[in-house]
């Protein structure tokens, strides 16, 4: 899989979690787990909001992102809000 496809899948996943306000659990490479809502993201970071606080998490420190509800990939993507 080429890098552009991988980034596109990341974008679809994170954007769906953000737009649909699906809570996620982010597992870091050091073993910590953070739960919250995705507020934004770019090529290198994810902004997670939890208990009214925002955290900027670097993607290189992320092991796994688990949505707490299913994210449907077969729905057509709408333009960015």
UniProtKB/Swiss-Prot annotation:
PANTHER family per UniProt: RNA-BINDING PROTEIN HFQ
HAMAP family attached to this UniProt entry:
Hfq
Q: Which GO terms describe its cellular component?
A: cytosol
- Record's InterPro entries? Hfq, LSM_dom_sf, Sm
Q: Subunit info?
A: Homohexamer.
Q: Where is the Sm domain?
A: 11-71
- Matching Gene3D superfamilies: 2.30.30.100
| Cross-referenced CDD domains | Hfq
Tell me the protein's name: RNA-binding protein Hfq
Q: What does this protein do?
A: RNA chaperone that binds small regulatory RNA (sRNAs) and mRNAs to facilitate mRNA translational regulation in response to envelope stress, environmental stress and changes in metabolite concentrations. Also binds with high specificity to tRNAs.
Q: Which family does it belong to?
A: Belongs to the Hfq family.
Residues spanning the signal sequence? none
Coiled-coil spans in chain = none
Q: Name one GO biological process term.
A: regulation of DNA-templated transcription
Q: Name one GO molecular function term.
A: RNA binding
What Pfam families does its record include?
Hfq
Keyword terms of this UniProt record: RNA-binding, Stress response
């Amino acid at each position: 899989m080429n890098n552009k496809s991988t980034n596109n899948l990341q974008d679809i996943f994170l954007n769906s979690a953000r737009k649909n306000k699906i809570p996620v659990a982010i597992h870091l490479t050091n073993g910590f787990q953070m739960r919250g809502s995705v507020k934004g993201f770019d090529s290198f970071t994810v902004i997670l909001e939890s208990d009214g606080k925002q955290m900027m998490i670097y993607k290189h420190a992320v092991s796994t992102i688990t949505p707490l509800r299913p994210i449907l990939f077969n729905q057509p993507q709408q333009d960015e809000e």
